[in-house]
Amino acid sequence: MGEESKKTGEKRLLILQTLAAMLEEPSLEKITTAALAKRLAVSEAALYRHFASKAQMYEGLIEFIEATLLGLIAKLTTEKADPVQQVEGILSVLLSFARKNRGMTRVLIGEALINEDPRLQKRINQLHDRLEAQLRQCLRFMDGGHAGKDPKLLANLYMAWVVGRWHQFAKSGFERDPAADWNASWNELGLLLKS
């Protein structure tokens, strides 16, 4: 029974990887289960043996994004004690993830979720809120609290900048690198943290 469970897990993973690959294509056409099944050379019924719905497939992608990003951020905040370095690291992680996972970027900005189950967009919004909360937490621990600096406002500003970079990347057909000129960008963004 363990071998069958392993094969099922592998098939689920293959379906999710194929869906992510299809999302990397610049076409803005809605991905149907028929197109996904055709790409995998299986029947639609075979897809539904592994996922109850297409929404569940997207949930699988969102779970991967969430686990990856929050895991990387947890590791980073454990390794770096300086809150400014933590903020810089988090922003870099968010941009690098998009660069390496182009199809996932379309999920992160909600583009791939248009006309899908509304709970998927809600789930992505919750992830954005969690990422912003991570930034806010780092900003709260800055030395001296940086009088006059509002961690909530700064975290929102940084997150809006990241989401803007994700949008530019996706809307350019993945031509405009979200992490382009990162050092120069951080030099400017980091000024917001100076007293």
Residue ranges and their predicted role:
Residues 41-51:
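Short hydrophobic/aromatic patch on the recognition helix
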Residues 5, 12-13, 33, 55, ...:
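Short, structured helix-loop boundary elements
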Residues 11, 54, 61, 65, ...:
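Hydrophobic/aromatic residues within well-ordered alpha-helical segments
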Residues 98-119, 171:
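Amphipathic alpha-helical segments used for helix-helix packing
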Residues 67-70, 74, 118-143, 152-156, ...:
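Amphipathic alpha-helical packing segments from all-alpha helical-bundle domains
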Residues 60, 74-100, 146-158:
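Hydrophobic alpha-helical connector segments
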Residues 96-100, 137, 155-176, 188-195:
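Amphipathic C-terminal alpha-helical segment
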Residues 1-26, 30-39, 56-59, 68:
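Basic, helix-initiating cap at the start of DNA-binding domains
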